[in-house]
């Protein structure tokens, strides 16, 4: 498994000066830096030959946005890429564990249908295609509709807060060895 890590630098005084003089320039600089990091990640993914890339992070950290940016960067480099959200593998509200105060624990790994995740990742690795569930967030249950996905020889970017749990990593290793 390759790991792509781009460490953050300490904030320099020049950056504070840019922010004070021109907030728009700071935003532009940040966007440019982000785009360079995404392009670097796309280059690493492409060179690795990986079929499946797992992207994780805390809630609301930009996983979905980053996954779609990475897919676009790979496509610009000539590698087909599609994004799969682990959110679509939620079992449904009736299966969610509860927090001590009685509210549903949406971030508990047990909310995900792990056997179905494994099945879909294996199919993507072995055949390059699978059928994905669709989760209906307004109804808090899995939709009857499904989404077929065909990698067309490209890369699948799987994003979710539990994408790098030990079970998912084990599936990734099994898929890579085939």
Task: List PLM regions with ranges.
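Charged, amphipathic alpha-helical linker segments immediately N-terminal to NTP-binding catalytic cores
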Residues: 1-40
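Conserved small/polar residues in nucleotide/adenosyl-binding loops
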Residues: 169-175
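Hydrophobic positions on the alpha1 helix immediately C-terminal to the Walker A/P-loop
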Residues: 66, 70
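Post-Walker A helix-loop "phosphate-sensing" segment adjacent to the P-loop in P-loop NTPases
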Residues: 72-82
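Conserved nucleotide-sensing/catalytic segment adjacent to the nucleotide-binding pocket
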Residues: 82-84, 91-138
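Walker A (P-loop) phosphate-binding loop of P-loop NTPases
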Residues: 60
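Hydrophobic anchor at the beta1->P-loop junction of P-loop NTPases
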Residues: 53-55
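Conserved lysine of the Walker
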Residues: 63
């Amino acid at each position: 498994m390759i790991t792509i890590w781009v460490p953050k630098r300490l904030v320099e005084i020049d950056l504070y000066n840019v922010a004070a003089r021109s907030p728009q320039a700071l935003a532009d600089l940040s966007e440019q830096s982000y785009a360079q990091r995404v392009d670097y990640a796309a280059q690493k993914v492409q060179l690795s030959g990986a079929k499946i890339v797992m992207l994780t992070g805390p809630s609301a950290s930009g996983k979905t946005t980053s996954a779609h940016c990475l897919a676009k960067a790979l496509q610009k480099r000539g590698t087909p890429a599609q994004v799969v959200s682990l959110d679509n593998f939620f079992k449904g509200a009736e299966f969610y564990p509860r927090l001590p105060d009685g509210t549903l624990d949406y971030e508990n790994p047990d909310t995900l249908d792990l056997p179905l995740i494994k099945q879909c990742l294996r199919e993507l690795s072995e055949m390059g295609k699978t059928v994905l569930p669709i989760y209906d967030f307004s109804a808090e249950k899995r939709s009857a509709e499904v989404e077929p996905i065909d990698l067309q020889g490209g890369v699948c970017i799987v994003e979710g807060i539990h994408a790098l749990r030990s079970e998912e990593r084990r599936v990734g290793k099994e898929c890579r060895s085939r």
